Amino acid sequence: MKKTRFISLLTLLAVCAMALPGTAMAHGVWFARRSDRIQLVCGEGWKDNAYDPDGLTTIKGYDADYADVAVEPIKGEDYLYIEPSDDLAAVYLEMDYGYWSNNADGEWIPKPMDEVEGSTIGTHALKYSMNYFKPVTE
């Protein structure tokens, strides 16, 4: 009986471990240097995705002591970038990536489920990110 429980536990752990990489590869947002700019990137791993710059709902800048510092997003065609001041140490942001639903063929469409025929999975993707450019105090 103990051996059966042990095997069941190992099987459960293996199934959970296989599910984690898919979760870890979800789209995220972060700042990265692109050419001569600090650009807000939305993507997964190596892949940058185009996005609607109007999806940025909140952006807050902080210095090393977490005092507010002005940070203004600058719009590109399908991205945002910032020009950090010398005292900018961290940036918090919130982004509404919109609704996404799969269609009957499994393709992802940027619409809510009730607008996509045959959809079985949908999401309203909200992204939150804290980005550090310099060390901060505790």
Task: Describe the predicted segments one by one.
Residues M1-K2, V15, M25:
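Generic low-polarity alpha-helical segments
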Residues H27-E138:
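N-terminal soluble domains immediately following signal/targeting peptides that reside
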Residues L10-A19:
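Bacterial N-terminal signal peptides
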Residues M1-L10:
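Bacterial N-terminal signal peptides that target proteins for export
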Residues L20-A26:
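Sec/Tat signal peptide C-region and signal peptidase I cleavage site
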